[in-house]
Protein backbone atom coordinates (compact mmCIF):
# COMPACT_ATOMS: atom_id res chain seq x y z
CA UNK A 1 0.00 0.00 0.00
CA UNK A 2 1.37 3.39 -1.00
CA UNK A 3 0.83 6.73 0.67
CA UNK A 4 -0.75 10.02 -0.30
CA UNK A 5 1.27 13.20 0.23
CA UNK A 6 -0.25 16.63 -0.32
CA UNK A 7 2.04 19.48 -1.37
CA UNK A 8 0.51 22.69 -0.04
CA UNK A 9 1.49 26.24 0.85
CA UNK A 10 -1.17 28.77 1.78
CA UNK A 11 0.40 31.59 -0.19
CA UNK A 12 0.47 31.30 -3.97
CA UNK A 13 3.60 31.69 -6.07
CA UNK A 14 6.00 29.86 -3.77
CA UNK A 15 6.84 27.10 -6.28
CA UNK A 16 4.52 24.39 -5.01
CA UNK A 17 3.84 22.89 -8.45
CA UNK A 18 7.56 22.94 -9.27
CA UNK A 19 8.26 21.08 -6.03
CA UNK A 20 5.52 18.53 -6.79
CA UNK A 21 6.80 17.88 -10.32
CA UNK A 22 10.46 17.57 -9.38
CA UNK A 23 10.03 15.54 -6.19
CA UNK A 24 7.58 13.20 -7.92
CA UNK A 25 9.98 12.73 -10.81
CA UNK A 26 12.86 12.12 -8.41
CA UNK A 27 10.85 9.41 -6.64
CA UNK A 28 10.19 7.73 -9.98
CA UNK A 29 13.92 7.88 -10.75
CA UNK A 30 14.67 5.76 -7.67
CA UNK A 31 12.21 3.11 -8.82
CA UNK A 32 8.98 4.22 -7.16
CA UNK A 33 5.65 4.18 -8.96
CA UNK A 34 4.28 7.71 -8.66
CA UNK A 35 0.98 9.39 -9.51
CA UNK A 36 0.88 13.20 -9.56
CA UNK A 37 -2.60 14.72 -9.15
CA UNK A 38 -3.31 18.37 -9.88
CA UNK A 39 -6.28 19.67 -7.86
CA UNK A 40 -5.94 23.34 -8.81
CA UNK A 41 -9.22 23.47 -10.75
CA UNK A 42 -9.31 26.24 -13.34
CA UNK A 43 -5.61 27.08 -12.95
CA UNK A 44 -3.86 23.84 -13.79
CA UNK A 45 -0.15 23.96 -14.58
CA UNK A 46 1.20 20.56 -13.64
CA UNK A 47 0.44 19.12 -17.07
CA UNK A 48 2.43 21.91 -18.72
CA UNK A 49 5.43 21.54 -16.41
CA UNK A 50 5.41 17.79 -17.04
CA UNK A 51 5.14 18.30 -20.81
CA UNK A 52 1.92 16.32 -21.26
CA UNK A 53 -0.59 19.12 -21.92
CA UNK A 54 -1.26 17.83 -25.46
CA UNK A 55 -1.89 14.30 -24.18
CA UNK A 56 -4.25 15.19 -21.33
CA UNK A 57 -7.73 14.32 -22.59
CA UNK A 58 -9.39 13.77 -19.21
CA UNK A 59 -8.99 15.20 -15.71
CA UNK A 60 -9.42 14.32 -12.05
CA UNK A 61 -13.11 15.33 -11.99
CA UNK A 62 -13.76 13.06 -14.97
CA UNK A 63 -12.41 10.17 -12.88
CA UNK A 64 -14.36 11.01 -9.71
CA UNK A 65 -17.56 11.35 -11.76
CA UNK A 66 -16.89 8.01 -13.53
CA UNK A 67 -16.71 9.60 -16.99
CA UNK A 68 -13.54 7.54 -17.37
CA UNK A 69 -11.34 5.45 -15.11
CA UNK A 70 -7.90 6.24 -13.73
CA UNK A 71 -6.17 4.23 -16.45
CA UNK A 72 -7.86 6.30 -19.13
CA UNK A 73 -7.19 9.67 -17.54
CA UNK A 74 -3.68 9.41 -16.07
CA UNK A 75 -0.95 10.18 -18.60
CA UNK A 76 2.26 8.19 -18.41
CA UNK A 77 5.47 10.19 -18.70
CA UNK A 78 7.34 9.38 -21.89
CA UNK A 79 10.72 9.84 -20.18
CA UNK A 80 9.99 8.36 -16.76
CA UNK A 81 7.89 5.19 -17.15
CA UNK A 82 7.12 4.92 -13.41
CA UNK A 83 5.52 8.38 -13.40
CA UNK A 84 1.89 9.23 -14.20
CA UNK A 85 0.08 12.58 -14.19
CA UNK A 86 -3.62 13.22 -13.58
CA UNK A 87 -4.42 16.84 -14.54
CA UNK A 88 -6.94 19.18 -12.95
CA UNK A 89 -9.95 20.43 -14.87
CA UNK A 90 -9.46 23.78 -16.55
CA UNK A 91 -13.16 24.53 -17.03
CA UNK A 92 -15.11 23.07 -14.10
CA UNK A 93 -15.87 24.68 -10.73
CA UNK A 94 -13.73 23.75 -7.72
CA UNK A 95 -16.78 22.51 -5.81
CA UNK A 96 -17.37 19.86 -8.48
CA UNK A 97 -14.43 17.87 -7.11
CA UNK A 98 -16.27 15.93 -4.40
CA UNK A 99 -14.00 15.21 -1.44
CA UNK A 100 -15.47 11.78 -0.66
CA UNK A 101 -15.14 10.66 -4.27
CA UNK A 102 -11.65 12.16 -4.42
CA UNK A 103 -10.65 10.16 -1.35
CA UNK A 104 -11.98 7.01 -3.01
CA UNK A 105 -9.81 7.79 -6.03
CA UNK A 106 -6.70 8.32 -3.88
CA UNK A 107 -7.34 5.18 -1.82
CA UNK A 108 -7.63 3.15 -5.01
CA UNK A 109 -4.49 4.78 -6.44
CA UNK A 110 -2.50 3.87 -3.30
CA UNK A 111 -3.07 0.20 -4.11
CA UNK A 112 -1.25 0.68 -7.42
CA UNK A 113 1.30 3.39 -6.71
CA UNK A 114 3.99 3.81 -4.08
CA UNK A 115 3.31 7.55 -3.90
CA UNK A 116 0.33 9.72 -4.77
CA UNK A 117 1.43 13.37 -4.71
CA UNK A 118 -1.36 15.95 -4.67
CA UNK A 119 -0.60 19.43 -5.97
CA UNK A 120 -2.88 21.52 -3.75
CA UNK A 121 -4.41 24.87 -4.72
CA UNK A 122 -3.17 27.99 -2.92
CA UNK A 123 -5.26 29.35 -0.08
CA UNK A 124 -7.32 27.59 2.59
CA UNK A 125 -10.70 27.36 0.87
CA UNK A 126 -12.61 24.39 -0.57
CA UNK A 127 -9.86 23.15 -2.89
CA UNK A 128 -7.39 23.08 0.01
CA UNK A 129 -9.74 21.06 2.20
CA UNK A 130 -10.53 18.65 -0.63
CA UNK A 131 -6.82 18.03 -1.31
CA UNK A 132 -6.09 17.42 2.40
CA UNK A 133 -9.03 15.08 2.94
CA UNK A 134 -7.33 11.89 1.64
CA UNK A 135 -3.75 12.79 2.62
CA UNK A 136 -1.49 10.67 4.84
CA UNK A 137 1.27 13.28 4.97
CA UNK A 138 1.72 16.94 4.08
CA UNK A 139 4.64 18.99 2.80
CA UNK A 140 4.21 22.74 3.27
CA UNK A 141 6.18 24.83 0.80
CA UNK A 142 7.27 28.34 1.75
CA UNK A 143 9.76 30.94 0.58
CA UNK A 144 11.82 33.06 2.99
CA UNK A 145 9.54 36.07 3.25
CA UNK A 146 7.30 37.04 6.15
CA UNK A 147 3.96 36.76 4.34
CA UNK A 148 4.69 33.27 2.99
CA UNK A 149 5.98 32.03 6.35
CA UNK A 150 2.96 33.39 8.21
CA UNK A 151 0.64 31.68 5.72
CA UNK A 152 2.63 28.45 6.05
CA UNK A 153 2.25 28.59 9.83
CA UNK A 154 -1.49 29.13 9.43
CA UNK A 155 -1.72 26.12 7.10
CA UNK A 156 0.25 23.95 9.55
CA UNK A 157 -2.16 24.90 12.33
CA UNK A 158 -5.22 24.07 10.23
CA UNK A 159 -3.81 20.69 9.23
CA UNK A 160 -2.89 19.81 12.82
CA UNK A 161 -6.33 20.70 14.21
CA UNK A 162 -8.70 19.75 11.38
CA UNK A 163 -7.04 16.87 9.50
CA UNK A 164 -6.20 14.07 11.92
CA UNK A 165 -5.70 11.77 8.93
CA UNK A 166 -2.44 13.62 8.20
CA UNK A 167 0.14 11.84 10.34
CA UNK A 168 3.18 13.93 9.47
CA UNK A 169 3.68 17.55 8.42
CA UNK A 170 7.01 18.75 7.05
CA UNK A 171 8.36 22.03 5.72
CA UNK A 172 10.13 22.69 2.42
CA UNK A 173 11.91 26.05 2.24
CA UNK A 174 12.07 27.00 -1.42
CA UNK A 175 14.15 29.59 -3.28
CA UNK A 176 16.53 30.31 -0.41
CA UNK A 177 19.31 32.79 -1.24
CA UNK A 178 22.13 32.18 1.29
CA UNK A 179 23.85 35.47 0.52
CA UNK A 180 20.71 37.40 1.51
CA UNK A 181 19.66 35.26 4.47
CA UNK A 182 23.19 35.25 5.94
CA UNK A 183 23.21 39.05 5.70
CA UNK A 184 19.86 39.33 7.44
CA UNK A 185 18.17 40.80 4.37
CA UNK A 186 15.74 37.87 4.11
CA UNK A 187 14.69 35.10 6.45
CA UNK A 188 16.92 32.08 6.80
CA UNK A 189 16.07 28.46 7.51
CA UNK A 190 16.22 28.96 11.29
CA UNK A 191 13.69 31.80 11.21
CA UNK A 192 11.40 29.84 8.89
CA UNK A 193 11.49 26.81 11.20
CA UNK A 194 10.86 29.01 14.24
CA UNK A 195 7.87 30.61 12.50
CA UNK A 196 6.28 27.46 11.12
CA UNK A 197 7.49 25.00 13.78
CA UNK A 198 7.25 21.74 11.84
CA UNK A 199 9.94 19.29 10.84
CA UNK A 200 12.15 20.33 7.92
CA UNK A 201 12.23 18.05 4.88
CA UNK A 202 14.50 20.16 2.69
CA UNK A 203 15.87 23.50 1.54
CA UNK A 204 15.84 24.33 -2.17
CA UNK A 205 18.22 27.13 -3.17
CA UNK A 206 17.36 29.82 -5.68
CA UNK A 207 18.68 28.46 -8.96
CA UNK A 208 18.56 30.05 -12.44
CA UNK A 209 18.51 26.53 -13.88
CA UNK A 210 14.88 26.15 -12.79
CA UNK A 211 13.79 28.95 -15.13
CA UNK A 212 16.06 27.72 -17.91
CA UNK A 213 14.85 24.14 -17.55
CA UNK A 214 11.19 25.16 -17.44
CA UNK A 215 11.57 27.28 -20.57
CA UNK A 216 13.01 24.25 -22.35
CA UNK A 217 10.35 21.86 -20.96
CA UNK A 218 12.88 20.13 -18.73
CA UNK A 219 12.92 19.28 -15.03
CA UNK A 220 15.73 20.36 -12.73
CA UNK A 221 16.10 16.86 -11.25
CA UNK A 222 17.29 15.79 -14.70
CA UNK A 223 19.90 18.57 -14.86
CA UNK A 224 23.22 17.60 -13.29
CA UNK A 225 24.28 21.25 -13.06
CA UNK A 226 21.26 22.23 -10.99
CA UNK A 227 21.71 22.58 -7.22
CA UNK A 228 17.94 22.85 -6.90
CA UNK A 229 17.66 19.55 -8.76
CA UNK A 230 19.96 17.92 -6.21
CA UNK A 231 17.86 19.38 -3.41
CA UNK A 232 14.68 17.95 -4.94
CA UNK A 233 16.31 14.52 -5.20
CA UNK A 234 17.30 14.70 -1.54
CA UNK A 235 13.76 15.66 -0.54
CA UNK A 236 12.44 12.65 -2.44
CA UNK A 237 14.86 10.38 -0.59
CA UNK A 238 13.84 11.82 2.79
CA UNK A 239 10.19 11.36 1.87
CA UNK A 240 11.07 7.71 1.22
CA UNK A 241 12.68 7.36 4.65
CA UNK A 242 16.32 7.76 3.61
CA UNK A 243 18.40 9.97 5.92
CA UNK A 244 20.36 12.49 3.85
CA UNK A 245 22.12 15.60 5.13
CA UNK A 246 21.11 19.03 3.88
CA UNK A 247 23.06 20.46 0.97
CA UNK A 248 25.90 22.80 1.82
CA UNK A 249 25.01 25.93 -0.11
CA UNK A 250 28.13 27.60 -1.45
CA UNK A 251 27.34 31.27 -2.03
CA UNK A 252 30.08 31.75 -4.59
CA UNK A 253 28.88 28.76 -6.57
CA UNK A 254 25.28 29.97 -6.49
CA UNK A 255 25.88 33.57 -7.45
CA UNK A 256 29.09 33.71 -9.47
CA UNK A 257 28.82 30.59 -11.58
CA UNK A 258 27.96 31.15 -15.23
CA UNK A 259 25.08 29.05 -16.50
CA UNK A 260 25.32 27.93 -20.07
Show where each model-derived region lies.
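P-loop/Walker-type NTP enzyme "switch/lid" segment
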Residues: 39-111, 212-216
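Inter-motif core of Ras-like GTPase G domains
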Residues: 111, 125-146
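NTP-binding/hydrolysis catalytic cores, primarily Walker-type P-loop NTPases
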Residues: 216-260
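Charged helix-capping and loop-helix junction motifs
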Residues: 99-103, 183-190
Amino acid sequence: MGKTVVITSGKGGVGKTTVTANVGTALSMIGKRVLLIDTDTGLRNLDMIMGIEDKALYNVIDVTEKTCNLDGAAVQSARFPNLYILPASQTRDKEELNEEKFKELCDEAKKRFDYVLIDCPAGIEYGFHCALYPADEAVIVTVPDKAAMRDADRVAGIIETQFKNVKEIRLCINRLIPELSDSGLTAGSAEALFTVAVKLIGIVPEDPNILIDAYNSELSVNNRRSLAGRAFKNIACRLDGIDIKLLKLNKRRLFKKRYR
